[in-house]
Structures are given as structure tokens and as C-alpha cells.
Regions:
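Short, well-structured alpha-helical segments in soluble
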Residues: 61-75, 177-190
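Hydrophobic alpha-helical
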Residues: 181-213, 226
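N-terminal glycine-rich anion-binding loop in soluble enzyme alpha/beta folds
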Residues: 1-67, 133-174
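C-terminal functional extensions of proteins
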Residues: 220-257, 280-283
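Conserved beta-alpha
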Residues: 99-164, 246-247
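Glycine/small-residue-rich loop that forms an oxyanion/phosphate-binding "nest" at active or ligand-binding sites
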Residues: 69-110
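Periplasmic-binding protein-like
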Residues: 78-83, 131-132, 190-198
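Compositionally biased, intrinsically disordered low-complexity segments enriched
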Residues: 253-274
Length: 283
């Protein structure tokens, strides 16, 4: 069979992604990626430590990240992204910048991290006050709050799940419930946006529904990572009815078929997390 008329495959541009060893949401990352871009993933080495500040530090050492980036150079990505929120905020703003520099030196290409992309997205959306949802323990959550505050953004509320493993098993319904708690207007006023932290937390399908209910932009770790990386390629992420990506959704756009003031519709669930989690909380 002569297939010469197809002329393909078409040229692809590459984004290298360094993910933590326990990252389980490869498919979610791809959902933000246009057809002409390919993701090339690698993972940090396994360490026998549960999700904690200790783990965040271990998987974000410059030598570890440099080695991971060098494994990607064979496929010549145009940008590399470190897809880990806690690993990129644990060292603060200065530490995040140093991380990007170390990755760029190793791969000779621009580098982004999830936490750096978060701050970039907050600037893009002109956010001065943000509510946070995390799957982390309180100690990890506090470091995220400090990271955001040092960037000049007020944290109006925060809900955390207290998980130390298998974060990818959290359901969309649980994410939505925690988002509502975090977004409640408190003494610091209403939030301009809501951030769903952790690249292992499923968020893609729940973002537009939460934006329609809460009437503020909702951004997530995987979303901002892909948005920032693709931005450096001069291309756009794919995300219908997501305020960060779709400008028409930045003024409280109602989803097609929804009446004004309607509540969050049913969202699909993903497999539940086992009963091995710490006490949930909010501040």
C-alpha cells in the first residue's frame, strides 16, 4: 500500500518533563498539550519516604534534577519543566529560581517549575488574594502559604487533606468539596482565584465546573506547569472554559447549558483514596 501521499508524521516540538518518582497523572498532563507538541517524561529516582518536606527536599536536589534533565537531552526538548509543586516551593522563591538555573545549565534550554509557573499565572490573572487547596499535611501546606505570601499575594483561606501517599486517588468530588471550603470569604476578604496544589492531584475536569460555581479563576498545578512550558514555545495550552487558558472564561463565564447561579454539576469521580490519611483541615 502506497502511503507516500500522507507526507507525515508532522513535525513535533518537545517539552521535557521531570516528574517525581511517584507521579501517576501522565495522561492529565497530555490533556493540556496541543497536537503539534510531544511530552517527554522522566522521573526522579525512588526514595522510601512518604510525601513530606523531607521528600520535597530530596527529590529537588540540583544534582538529581540535573541528571534527570540530561536524560532528556537525547530527544532535544525545547523547554524542560519540573512537574512538582512541593519540590519547587520547599526552597522558597530564591530556591525555585536556582532550581530553574540548574536545570537550564544541564539541558541548555529554558526551564520552568510548577511553583514558578504558579506565580507566573497569578501575575497573568492579576491575582492579589488567593485561596489554596492542598492534599498535603499541615507542615507542607504552611510552606506553600509562606511561598505565596512572600510573592506578595495574600492567602485568604486554605483547605488541606493531610495525605502522605497515593494522592492521585483523590476523587474530583473531594477536590470540589475542599475547594468550596477554601474559597469561603474570610476575614481577609474574598479570593481573586483558587489554586489546587500538587501535580499528583487530579484536576482537569473539575476546573471549569468550579470556575462556574465560584466565579473566580481556578488554577491547578498541572495546568500552570503545562501553560508556562508551552508559553515558552510560543504556543498555547488546550483547556476549554479554563480562565488561565481561555480569555473568554475570565469574567465568570457560565458553562454551556448552565443557568446563572447554578451549583456545581456532577463531576466524574476517580478511584477513592484509602482511609490512610491524616485529619483534614482548613485555615
Amino acid at each position: 500500500m502506497d502511503v507516500s501521499f500522507l507526507g507525515g508524521p508532522g513535525p513535533q516540538r518537545g517539552v521535557g518533563v521531570v516528574a517525581p518518582f511517584d507521579f501517576a497523572l501522565d495522561r492529565e498532563l497530555w490533556r493540556w498539550v496541543p497536537d503539534e507538541v510531544s511530552l517527554h517524561l522522566t522521573r526522579t529516582p525512588y526514595v522510601p519516604v512518604e510525601v513530606s518536606l523531607d521528600l520535597a527536599r530530596l527529590i529537588s536536589e540540583h544534582e538529581t534534577l540535573g541528571d534527570a534533565v540530561r536524560t532528556l537531552t537525547a530527544v532535544a526538548p525545547e523547554v524542560v519543566a519540573y512537574a512538582c509543586t512541593s519540590g519547587s516551593f520547599v526552597g522558597g522563591i530564591v530556591g525555585e529560581r536556582a532550581m530553574c538555573e540548574a536545570m537550564s545549565r544541564a539541558g541548555a534550554v529554558p526551564a520552568v517549575t510548577t511553583s514558578g509557573a504558579l506565580l507566573e499565572a497569578l501575575v497573568e490573572l492579576d491575582v492579589r488574594r488567593v485561596a489554596l487547596v492542598t492534599p498535603y499535611t499541615v507542615s507542607v501546606t504552611r510552606v506553600l502559604e509562606s511561598y505565596v505570601a512572600r510573592a506578595g499575594v495574600t492567602v485568604t483561606g486554605c483547605a488541606y487533606m493531610g495525605l502522605t501517599r497515593q494522592i492521585w486517588k483523590v476523587t474530583y468530588r473531594e477536590v470540589a468539596d475542599m475547594a468550596r471550603r477554601a474559597a469561603v470569604r474570610g476575614r481577609l476578604g474574598a479570593a481573586d482565584a483558587l489554586f489546587l496544589s500538587c501535580t499528583n492531584l487530579p484536576t482537569y475536569d473539575v476546573i471549569p465546573q468550579l470556575e462556574a460555581e465560584l466565579r473566580i479563576p481556578v488554577i491547578s498545578a498541572n495546568q500552570v506547569t503545562m501553560w508556562a512550558a508551552l508559553r515558552r514555545l510560543g504556543t498555547r495550552a488546550v483547556g476549554p472554559y479554563q480562565a488561565l487558558i481561555d480569555a473568554s472564561a475570565r469574567s465568570g463565564t457560565v458553562l454551556p447549558g448552565q443557568a446563572s447561579g447554578s451549583v456545581l454539576p456532577d463531576v466524574p469521580d476517580v478511584p477513592g483514596v484509602p482511609e490512610e490519611k491524616q485529619q483534614e483541615g482548613w485555615t
